[in-house]
Structures are given as structure tokens and as C-alpha cells.
Amino acid sequence: VLILVVSDIPYDDYMAGNAPINNLLGVSIVALALPLYEQLRQIAKQWKIILSVVTLASLFSMFTGAIFAIILGASPEMVATVLPKSITTPIAMEVSSHLGGIPAVTAVGVIVAGLQGSVFGYLILKKLGIKQQEAVGLSVGAVSHALGTVSCMEADPKAGSYSSISLVLCGIMSSILAPLVFHVIRLFL
């Protein structure tokens, strides 16, 4: 981000140059489907718990991001921009746009959240003594989407599978809940 700002490179030019790499993201998501398929029976048995956890994680992520933005004095436009930070990039940009945010800035926030989760998420949960790979995967996938899911997959296929389902369900739940959350938050702005 700093390089883009200092070099005065428009975000649209950056995204156009990054298109081949971004296209590979779709391929990597498909590659995550095999471990997910291998865990399908166990995931199907726990669908109510998984959906509850993912819904709460989506709400928590949106509210905490918005609250920090408000504490820092952000405008409603910036609150709408950071609200979808924990959804995968294409969905987050669309949600941001729908709420009146700035999709390009949202994309940067999503990348930062993904990098933080992929680098630190699995390690932090391990240090906290969380041993259930299902919980690790759901947590990391909920807050750091595809990048976090890849780091989970490298550490443990079961965690990666749960992270995959978490990133998909968080995208769905967040896009459904974001307008409601933003409306509630705007009451306090």
C-alpha cells in the first residue's frame, strides 16, 4: 500500500497488473475443495454448530472493525469501507460498494487481514492451547479468508477443510448481514 501511495500508482492500474495472480486465486480455491470433500461427512453432522459459529464470527468481525473505525473518527463512508474486511476480496469489494464504502480501500484491508491471519492466526490459536483443528479452521477462515485457509491447509488438512467452509459461509453470512449491521452502526454515528 505504501509503495502504491508513494509511487502514485492508481489502484486500478495495480489491479490490472495483478490480474494474472488474482486469477490464480480462483484455481487455488478449487484446490481446497478436495480436503473439504474428504471432511464432508463430519462437516455435515456439525452444520448447525458451524453455521452458528460462522454467523457469530461474521457479526463480531464486522462490529469490531466498525467500532475501531468509529473510535478513530472515521466517516460513515470509511466505516462502510472497513466493515467487510474479513470477507474474501471480491465479495468484500461488492459489499463495500453497496454500503457506500470505497472498494479499492476495502481490498487493501482484506489483504492486510488475510496476511495477518495467515501469518499469525494458526500460531496464536496454537499458543492459546486450542487443539481442535475444527475450531482452528473455523476461526482462521472466518477472519482471514483464503490466505488464512492456505496456511491452515499447510498445517493440517482438517483445519484447512474447516477454514474453507468458514470462508465460504462467512462470505455468504456477511454479505447478508452487512447492510443490517451498517444500519445499526449508523444509528450511533
Residue ranges of each PLM-predicted region?
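Entry/N-cap segments of selected transmembrane alpha helices
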Residues: P20, L40-G65, A107-Q116, L167-M173
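Helix-loop-helix hairpins and the membrane-proximal interhelical loops
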Residues: P35-W47, I70-I71, E94-L115, K127, ...
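Juxtamembrane boundary at the C-terminal end of a transmembrane helix
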Residues: L177-L189
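C-terminal ends of transmembrane helices
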Residues: L32-K45, G121-L128, G148-A155
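Alpha-helical membrane segments and immediately flanking helix-loop junctions
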Residues: M78-V105, I111-V112, Q116, K131-L169
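Transmembrane alpha-helices that form the ion-translocation and gating core
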Residues: S52-A92, A113-I130
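Helical membrane-embedded segments and adjacent short helical loop/helix-boundary regions
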Residues: V1-P35, K45-V53, A57
